[in-house]
């Protein structure tokens, strides 16, 4: 029987939110696309370090263990090509993350695939991609640095800041 997606929460996450791609992104910015591609392919067996959203994704996927069913699915959306994305998928396997669906967009913004994957939420570090997702009618959020480190407990916490009060300089 095919898996039904309408009875689960499907969250799309960008590869730069899931993993720390700052170093390789610097290569891209300073040396160009070919140097970036060579850099990623040469390191495809080296796991990437967890990114800003890694603890959140890990906890969301652990909900399935607690609930005894697949109630949450995380889908990866990436600007990487399939070749450079191999390092990302190898990192997913290294950390035993249950992520099996992905779109590698070859440099294009991945927001176009949100509806095709049946996602109800899109999380990214890229504010422009988040705006496009919102324009498509999908809930989306730009992830901001927590600067608080990784949480060691199993609690899952969200803070929504629709009017930019919580995370602005004016918050006291």
Where is each model-derived feature located?
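Generic short alpha-helical hydrophobic face used as a protein-protein interaction/packing hotspot
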Residues: 64, 137, 168-170
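Short N-terminal or domain-adjacent regulatory/targeting segments
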Residues: 47-61, 146-147
């Amino acid at each position: 029987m095919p898996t039904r997606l309408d009875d689960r929460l499907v969250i799309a996450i960008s590869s730069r939110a899931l993993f720390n791609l700052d170093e390789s992104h610097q290569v891209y910015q300073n040396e160009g696309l070919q140097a970036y591609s060579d850099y990623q392919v040469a390191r495809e067996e080296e796991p990437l370090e967890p990114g800003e959203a890694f603890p959140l994704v890990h906890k969301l996927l652990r909900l399935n263990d607690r609930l005894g069913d697949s109630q949450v699915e995380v889908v990866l959306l990436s600007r990487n090509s399939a070749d450079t994305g191999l390092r990302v998928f190898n990192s997913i396997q290294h950390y035993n993350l249950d992520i099996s669906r992905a779109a590698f967009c070859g440099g294009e913004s991945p927001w176009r695939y949100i509806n095709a994957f049946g996602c109800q939420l899109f999380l990214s570090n890229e504010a422009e991609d988040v705006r496009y997702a919102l324009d498509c009618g999908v809930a989306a959020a730009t992830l901001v640095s927590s600067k608080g480190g990784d949480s060691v407990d199993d609690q899952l916490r969200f803070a929504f800041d629709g009017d930019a009060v919580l995370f602005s300089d004016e918050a006291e």
